[in-house]
């Protein structure tokens, strides 16, 4: 029910900000104790052409991971590598691990914004060749309980390449 309740808001935010993707992953465990392959509930919605025209029925969007019941209730298409949950892989999950675990282990809890994290390098979701840069921050309850992350994805190529002035990014001394 919670994922269904937030799915339309995630789509709205993704469209409004012209993002390639948006996701929420729920977790209440110490990730240092989680083995690779551990699954966490969540949703990842992707738009391969955020600058292009979009369908009122969201036919231009796909779900990278989400429970099957959410796929049925939203009517969104599934990606070819769709999974019913997020599969944790420590070496490829900094977008989850760093903001979540840092907030979880903090002696003095700060605002979720203070734990925000941009990935340093693009990464790929399992069985998907498209690389993504991501920004994520932990989800924190008023009592300090850290229960997951919310984040955005930006396709690194060609979407970001078309947005960034590469001639201005060159370091020539």
Segments the model singles out, each with a brief description of its role:
Residues 33-38:
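Short, solvent-exposed loop/turn and secondary-structure capping segments
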Residues 67-153, 159-161:
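Extracytoplasmic/periplasmic ligand-binding sensor regions of membrane-associated signaling proteins
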Residues 39-41, 129:
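Charge-enriched interaction surfaces
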Residues 5-10, 149-173:
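Solvent-exposed, extracytoplasmic
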Residues 1-4, 17-20, 132:
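Juxtamembrane extracytoplasmic/periplasmic/luminal helical "stalk" adjacent to the first N-terminal
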């Amino acid at each position: 029910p919670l994922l269904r309740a937030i799915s339309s808001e995630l789509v709205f935010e993704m469209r409004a900000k012209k993002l390639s993707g948006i996701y929420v992953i729920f977790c209440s465990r110490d990730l240092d104790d989680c083995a690779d392959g551990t699954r966490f509930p969540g949703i990842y919605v992707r738009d391969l052409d955020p600058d292009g025209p979009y369908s009122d029925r969201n036919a231009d969007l796909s779900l990278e991971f989400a429970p099957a019941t959410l796929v049925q209730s939203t009517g969104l298409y599934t990606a070819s590598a769709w999974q019913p949950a997020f599969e944790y892989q420590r070496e490829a999950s900094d977008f989850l691990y760093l903001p979540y675990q840092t907030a979880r282990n903090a002696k003095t809890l700060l605002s979720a914004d203070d734990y925000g994290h941009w990935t340093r390098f693009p990464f790929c979701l399992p069985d998907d060749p498209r690389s993504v840069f991501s920004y994520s921050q932990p989800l924190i309850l008023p009592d300090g309980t850290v229960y997951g992350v919310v984040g955005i994805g930006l396709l690194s190529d060609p979407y970001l390449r078309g947005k960034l002035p590469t001639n201005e990014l060159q370091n020539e001394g």
